[in-house]
C-alpha cells in the first residue's frame, strides 16, 4: 500500500501537471476576445449584391498554381486552368497566410470572423462548440452554407437565429478509403438544387436574390485525399482538377441564375497540407493557401513592371502578375466590404486595398471604418484592464500619440480630400494603416498586461514542485526515520497572509479559475517545504553522504549538463544518438568487465541510436513492418526457450496465445495495407480482426495471465512486451516496431548491467548508482518519444495506420489510438524501472520518484523558451516542447499506477514450478 505522503505526492503531481500544462495557453496564447463593441459599417455603397465564398479545405497554394506532373497519367500541366485564367485576366490573387494551429476550425474562424482563436481552440471540437463571437455570416443578410458537418454547424449555431442555413452530408461520407470527390460533388449538387427549387417556390427565389446574401461552399475533398494519399497523389490532384472544373460551371450558373454581374467570388483554403498528408503545425506548406478574388468590386489583375521571381513561385508562370499576399483574417474584412456589411466586431483583419476596385476616397473611408472597428476593441479591452488593476500603465504608443489625435488627423485629411486635395490620399491611407498597426499592438499589450505577475507565480509553482517532490523522495526512500512535521504559527501566518492577499489580487483582476489554481500549487508546495525543511536538510546530507564537496559540485554540474543537453535534443534529435553512443561505454567506465554482455550492450546502443537520425515524419513501408514483426516473433520465441524452465503449462499457453496474436495481427495489417494501397477500401474482415486482436491482446490476455500469474521478473517483462506488440504493429507506419523491439531490449540489458554493477559494488552509505540510474532513466523517458518522432511532428502524425482500424473520419478515437501508440514505450520503461528497484534492493518507485522530482527542470526551461513571435513553425515547436516536457512527468506519475499493476507480486527468485499436468 502507498503511504499517505506518497498518495498526496501522486494526486498533487497529476493535478499540478494537468493545470500547468494549460498555463502557456492562458499566458502566452490568449485571444483578445472582448464583447460590448458597437458596429462599424464597412461602406455605404456595397460593390456587390452577393458573395460566394469557396473554401478548398486542405488546398495548398503551390498545388493550385504550379504546373504538376500527374503520377498516373504522366501529363505535365496545370491542375486549375480556370482559376489561373481568372488570375491572368479577371481576378486579384495572392497567398493567404494562416496561423497555427493550421486546423479547420481556427482557419475558418480567421477567414469568416477575422479573429485568431488562441492555440487551444483546436481542442474545442467542431459542431459541439459554435463560435461565441461575431462573424461575417452573422452580418450578412442571409447565409446559405454547404459542406461538412464538422464546420457548418459551428457558424450556424453561433449566429443570430435563422441567419444561416446549412446543407450537410453525414459523417459516414468522410470515409478516407473512398473517393474524396464525392464530398465536393455533394456541395455543388445541392447548391444547384437550391437554384432549381426557386422555379417552384417564389418566396425562396425572393430570399435568395435579395442583396447582401452569402453562399458558403466548404469543399472537404482535398483535405480527405491529402490525408489518405498525400498531397502529391493522383487522388489529391484529381480533386483539385474537379474543383477547378466545378468552379467554372458554378460561375456560369450563378450569372445565369441572377442575370447580372453583381456577384463577388472568393476562392481560398483554411490551411494547406504537408508532404506527408498532415497539418496542424506551422510549416509553410500548411500556412500558405491560395486566395483568388474576382467579380463585382474586385480589381482586375495588375501587371508587374518587371517580372518578379522567387523560389516558391518560380513554377507558377505568374511572375508578370502582381501577387497580393494577405493574412487570413484580412479575408473577413474584404468580404464585409464587398457586400457592404458591418465589420465583425471581433475582427482584427485589415482591409486589403489592393483587391478593391473603387475610387481612392471610397477605399480610404472603408479602411478608416475598419480601423475604428479595431480601435473599438482596444478601448473596450482597456476599460476591462483598468477596472481590474490597482494601478494601470497606459500603452506607450498611445501615450506618445493619443488615439484621439490619430482620429482627428485622419478625419481632417478625409475632409480635405473631399474638397479636392486628392494628393493627400496616400498620406491618409498610410496614417490609417499606422493606426491599425498601433491598435493591434496595443491589443497585444493589453492581452499580456499581467504576464510578469502570472509568470512569476508559475515559476514559483515549478520550483516548488521540484523541491517538494524531492523532499518527498528523501522522506520515503532515503531517511529511515519518521518525522512528525507540524505547521508552526509563523507558517500559518506567512502563507495564510499570502493566500489572502494574492487571491484578492486575482479576484480584483477578475482572473479566470485557472489562475487561482496556478497560485494554489506554489502556496501549498512552499508551505510544505517550509514545514519539512528539517527533512530536506537531513535528507540531502544522507543522500550525498560519503561524497566529497568537489565531487558533489562535479555531480551537480554533470546532472545540469545532461538535462540541458536533453533540452537541446528537443530541437536536434541527433543529440540523443550521441548520448546513446556515449552510454555504450557506461559499463566499462563503471568497472563492469563482462565482454560478452558489454558487446551486446554496445551493439544495442548503436542500433537504438539510429532511430533519432531517421526522419521523424514517416512514409508507410510494409516491408519494414513485416521484418520488424518477424524479429519480434523470433525474439519472443528466443525468450520463451530461454525461460522455458521457469514456465508452467498455464503460462506456456499464455505465451503461445500471445505469439499467435502477434502473427494474426501481422496478417490483418498486411491485408489492410495492401487493400488500402490498391485503393479498394478497408476489408471488413481485416478491420474486425484488427480490433478484436487489439482488444484481446491489450485487455483479455493480461487478465488471463493474472488469473494464475508467473512472478518471475523476466517472464513478466516478456509478457508485457508481447501484450503491446500487436497494438504497436497495426499502428506502425514504417520503423516504429523496430524501435519498440530495440528499446525493450535496451531496457532489459540495462536492468541486467545495473544488477551486476550492484553485485560488484560493496554496500556504501551514499547513492551514486541511484543517481546514475535516475539520469539514464530520465534520458530514456525522453527517448521513449523521440525514438519515433519529434515535437514538430506531434500535430503531423500520419493517419495511415489509423485507417487500418477506422476508415471514417472521427478525430477523437483516432487521436486516442495515436496516444496509445505513444505511451506504450513509457509503459515498458516504467515496468523496467520497477524491476530495477527490486534488482538494486531499493524501495519500490525510488527511481521513478527521483526522475519525477527532477524532470520539471525541462518544463521550466521550455516555459521560458516559448515564442509568441517569429515563424509559426518556430512557435509551434516551442509549444510542443513544453507540452511534451510536462507530459513526460505526467506520464511517469500515471504509469507508476500502471507499473504497480503489471508488476504485482513480481519476484527475483525462481518460482516454484507447478505440475505440467493440466487440471
Swiss-Prot record:
Single Gene Ontology MF annotation: mannose-ethanolamine phosphotransferase activity
Gene Ontology BP terms: cell wall organization; GPI anchor biosynthetic process
Localization in the cell: Endoplasmic reticulum membrane
CC terms in the record's Gene Ontology section: endoplasmic reticulum membrane
Main enzyme class: transferase
Residues linked to a glycan: 138, 196, 201, 285, 311
One Pfam family recorded for the sequence: PigN
Membrane-spanning segments: 9-29, 457-477, 488-508, 511-531, 559-579, 599-619, 621-641, 654-674, 687-707, 719-739, 774-794, 816-836, 846-866, 883-903
Segments on the Cytoplasmic side according to the record's topology features: 1-8, 478-487, 532-558, 620, 675-686, 740-773, 837-845, 904-919
Disulfide bond annotation, renumbered to this chain: none
Membrane topology, Lumenal segments: 30-456, 509-510, 580-598, 642-653, 708-718, 795-815, 867-882
Pathway: Glycolipid biosynthesis; glycosylphosphatidylinositol-anchor biosynthesis
UniProt keyword Protease, yes or no: no
Alphabetical UniProt keywords: Cell wall biogenesis/degradation, Endoplasmic reticulum, Glycoprotein, GPI-anchor biosynthesis, Membrane, Transferase, Transmembrane, Transmembrane helix
Membrane topology term: Multi-pass membrane protein
Keyword match Acetylation: no
Documented EC number(s): 2.-.-.-
Family: Belongs to the PIGG/PIGN/PIGO family. PIGN subfamily.
PANTHER family: GPI ETHANOLAMINE PHOSPHATE TRANSFERASE 1, PHOSPHATIDYLINOSITOL GLYCAN, CLASS N
Biological role stated in the UniProt entry: Ethanolamine phosphate transferase involved in glycosylphosphatidylinositol-anchor biosynthesis. Transfers ethanolamine phosphate to the first alpha-1,4-linked mannose of the glycosylphosphatidylinositol precursor of GPI-anchor.
Protein name (database record): GPI ethanolamine phosphate transferase 1
The species this protein was found in: Kluyveromyces lactis (strain ATCC 8585 / CBS 2359 / DSM 70799 / NBRC 1267 / NRRL Y-1140 / WM37) (Yeast)
